[in-house]
Amino acid sequence: MATTLKNHHRRVAIISYHIGKAYGLSEERLNNLVIAAALHDIGALTVSERDELIKMDVENPQPHARLGSYMLDSFAPFHEISRILYYHHWSYNRDDQWVVTKGKVPVESYILHVADRIDILQWFTFSSRRNQYFFIANSQRFLLVGY
């Protein structure tokens, strides 16, 4: 397994949990957020596709988000998780996206988007395991600026 993928989903789930908790999400919404974070790249079906995602996420992240959402949408208990996944690459501060969705993007999608970006950035920034765990453990403090 590629080093860029190893434990990525777990780290994103942990970061998402801390942001969601600080944001004041209910227990149910927090649980859905953590599940969505753990599954957020399910639309990239192979490890090589996931590695490619890291390279192309900036240019066109939507195909895997839509595919992952569609995969889960038909399972009733995962309907809300599917909605979170569908929008997990939508930026909070993009007016054009806000107009298109008319404010219907779940806040969990924005939280997941930020957590995913932070993990990818910190993974490439911090080389030592000690720094990575410090960042994850303190993510709640670092991430509240935009919320």
Which stretches of residues belong to each language-model region?
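Histidine- and acidic-residue-rich, metal-dependent catalytic cores
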Residues: M1-Y147
